[in-house]
Amino acid sequence: LHRSNGKKSDVWGLVGGTNEGTETPWEGLKREIVEEIGDVTTIKKTLPLESFLSNDKKFLFHTYLCVVKDEFIPQLNKEHDGYAWCSFTKWPKPLHHGLRNTLQSKINLSKLETVFQTINLLDN
């Protein structure tokens, strides 16, 4: 998603936000998906990719991989003005710094590659 406003504007990132009240990370993810792209029904499977604590130890970040059956046109909210379906190795730029760090991690790339290979095997 291309961020259109706020302090992190003009960068490409993922659906995201802060959990509200007593929300679990999973509940927060579902709510943020609905708020930012409009629909969770297209998601076949959701897999945790990574969790990490911010440098100041104030925030615990969770990143998930959501597998969809088919690409779709998201209903973007006012936070975003664009979206892209990308190949595994060709990401739009500039990336949000957190997403860039996630995608530079060899562990995360290995996890993503395994999931994509598994999906391709199952779909053939």
Regions found by a protein language model. Give the residues of each.
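Hydrophobic pocket/interface hotspot
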Residues: L1, L29, I33, Y83
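A generic structural signal for short hydrophobic patches within well-formed alpha-helices
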Residues: N19, W91-P94
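Short aromatic-enriched loop/helix-cap "lid" or pocket-rim segments at secondary-structure transitions
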Residues: W12, H97-G98
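The catalytic Nudix box helix
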Residues: L14-L47
